[in-house]
């Protein structure tokens, strides 16, 4: 059930292993060049909403995107142009001028966002990994798969992976 009203296509974007791992020690575990290109192509020019730890995992803010960072820390210092809020609801409100804002992590933010997003852009990495951050199971009663593209591993991609788009039923 959706719990927040918004007029845009609020999209969650995530890469998930076969055993639902999304990260370890606040970092990505795998490097899939085409998945990173897809992330850039989809999110470029849009608001990206993330938790503080996800933001701090970047060497610097990502170009051509409006960063909205959720943190409980009072007086959190961020680079100029980065918007700081204290809740997912406040982040969505700050992104309301964007027709397609993205939720980009991390684990706690994803759990909250599943209740409010319209679309999930999901990369399934066809391999199991050890990790400490997991993505919840996607319920088929709430989400409908609308697109799937399989990519075989190759010289640039150590693992098979699939792009899957889910839309809220």
Model region roles, listed by residue range:
Residues 2-169:
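Enzymes that bind and transform nitrogen-containing heteroaromatic metabolites
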């Amino acid at each position: 059930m959706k719990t927040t009203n918004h007029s845009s296509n609020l999209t969650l974007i995530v890469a998930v292993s076969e055993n639902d791992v999304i990260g370890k020690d606040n970092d990505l575990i795998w490097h899939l060049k085409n998945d990173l290109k897809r992330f850039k192509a989809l999110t470029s020019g849009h608001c990206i909403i993330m938790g503080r730890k996800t933001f701090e995992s970047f060497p610097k803010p990502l170009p051509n995107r409006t960063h909205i960072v959720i943190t409980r820390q009072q007086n959190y210092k961020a680079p100029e142009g980065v918007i700081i809020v204290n809740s997912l609801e406040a982040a969505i409100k700050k992104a309301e001028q964007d027709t397609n804002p993205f939720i980009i992590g991390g684990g706690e933010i994803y759990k909250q966002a599943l209740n409010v997003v319209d679309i999930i852009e999901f990369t399934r990495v066809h391999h199991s990994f050890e990790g400490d951050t997991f993505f919840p199971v996607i319920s088929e009663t709430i989400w409908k798969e609308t697109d799937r593209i399989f990519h075989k591993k190759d010289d640039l991609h150590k693992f098979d992976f699939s792009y899957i788009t889910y839309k809220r039923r």
